[in-house]
């Protein structure tokens, strides 16, 4: 998404699915972490939450972070505190979480265009974080540092609970002989979720 907004991608690190990454970002070199950090003006850290603190501090210990460099992570549960080792070396910490379920395919670009992003950053650079969210295609929503855990809990509830309930429902339908339980429930679940989202978006009635 950022490439489409005019950003030049200087490199990506090797991950769990290099083939898929190459398909989505053709021609972008795969480099080691230190080399990506050395070349980039904006570093995006999209790693599991448990790995983020060690990654940030490890790069700091190797002297990788640069003054004025933008460092953005996409973890829903953490704000900018986890980026303190980078900030102490002059980097600008940003936390931007696009509220979509990533597939690792071009479908993600379409989802981003209709999505929102939770944004946390120091007040002086909050407009930068908001602008990057917009360039991804998202509408930015500011989340306070102290509220990131509650935000992550809300996101986890919406995604994991939905998967669990649908899994239970499809299993019961399959047990009674429904051959395509996912297809059977598709329209019902989508319309129910859309109705619930509309109800949640409506302003409360005046008393």
What are these regions (language model features)?
Residues 1-38:
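NAD(P)+-binding Rossmann beta1-loop-alpha1 motif at the extreme N-terminus of oxidoreductases
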Residues 14, 98, 145:
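Active-site donor-binding loop signature of nucleotide-sugar glycosyltransferases
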């Amino acid at each position: 998404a950022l490439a489409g907004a005019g950003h030049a991608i200087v490199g990506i690190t090797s991950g769990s699915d290099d083939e898929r990454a190459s398909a989505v970002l053709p021609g972008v070199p795969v480099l080691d972490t230190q080399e990506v950090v050395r070349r980039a003006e904006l570093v995006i850290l999209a790693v599991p939450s448990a790995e983020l603190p060690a990654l940030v501090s490890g790069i700091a210990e190797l002297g990788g972070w640069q003054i004025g460099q933008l460092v953005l992570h996409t973890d829903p549960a953490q704000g900018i505190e986890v980026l303190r080792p980078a900030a102490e070396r002059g980097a600008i910490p940003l936390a931007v979480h696009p509220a979509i379920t990533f597939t690792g395919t071009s479908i993600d670009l379409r989802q981003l265009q209709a999505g929102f992003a939770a944004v946390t950053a120091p007040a002086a650079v909050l407009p930068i974080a908001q602008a990057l969210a917009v360039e991804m295609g998202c509408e930015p929503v500011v989340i306070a540092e102290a509220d990131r855990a509650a935000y992550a809990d809300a996101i986890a509830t919406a995604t994991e609970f939905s998967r669990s309930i649908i899994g239970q429902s499809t299993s019961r339908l399959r047990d009674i002989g429904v051959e395509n339980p996912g297809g059977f429930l598709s329209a019902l679940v989508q319309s129910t979720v859309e109705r619930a989202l509309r109800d949640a978006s409506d302003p409360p009635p005046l008393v």
